[in-house]
Amino acid sequence: MYFRQSYTEKMPNYYYDGSFDGLLTVIYVAYEDRKSNALRVSSETEQLILEFDDIHIMTDFSKARRVEKNICKKLSQAFLNKMRTCFLSCDKNKDTIIVHTVYKALKQGEEILNSLDEHAFRMNRLIKQVLSERHKYLGVLRFREMKDRTMFATIEPKNNILPALISHFRNRMKKKKFAIFDKEREMIAYYDTEKVEIFFVKSPEIEWSDEEMEYSELWKTFHKSISIKERENKKLQQSNLPKYYWKHLVEDM
């Protein structure tokens, strides 16, 4: 599905810092400016040079909380969660899609997501893409033990699914320190059994424990020993799980 021509015509562009609170601030400000029917939204990660008629929005946490509260009250917490999920998409138009869908939902109800409305349709598709990639990584993500006993894993997702993965493993590994490194975005999330911290790092220094090195070799040996060469089917493997997701598997596929 493609946006109609009016989508690309000259219209105010709201430029923000790329954070979810920043996007919520845009929703508040654009509504106050009565520009909610025709606007574009860009984050600083997508656009480095401002044009003459761009509107730069500073993140306002109080306005963001008001928008959150209003969405939960007039729509639902589930709708807000869908916004958060869509926000993790790598699609460069996600910001504009979310904002327009929110405005329409506030007028017509969250049932708009079940319609063929262009923005709602695109938002649903982005949500499905994010959740699908998260599901794939839940199946292939491999933790390895570092010398300090922290469990470490590396991912290279297309979408920014690190926050969604952290919430899952935090519930599963409550008493275990772990870190997940998003190599694509040079971002790492660290859980110390109490809280999660997310920060940026280009290349973390890693030292595996002696036990990890031993078990990794044992696992590779086991994986090879149970494999029946005559029955290998790489095409079927790639059909079930694209090779893109094999990069950081301990075993040799």
Predicted regions span which residues?
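Long, compositionally biased intrinsically disordered terminal regions
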Residues: 177, 188-189, 207-253
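Intrinsically disordered or highly flexible coil/loop and linker segments, enriched in small
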Residues: 37, 77-80, 136, 175-179, ...
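Short coil/turn segments at secondary-structure boundaries
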Residues: 82-86, 183-184, 232-238
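N-terminal ordered "arm"
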Residues: 2-61
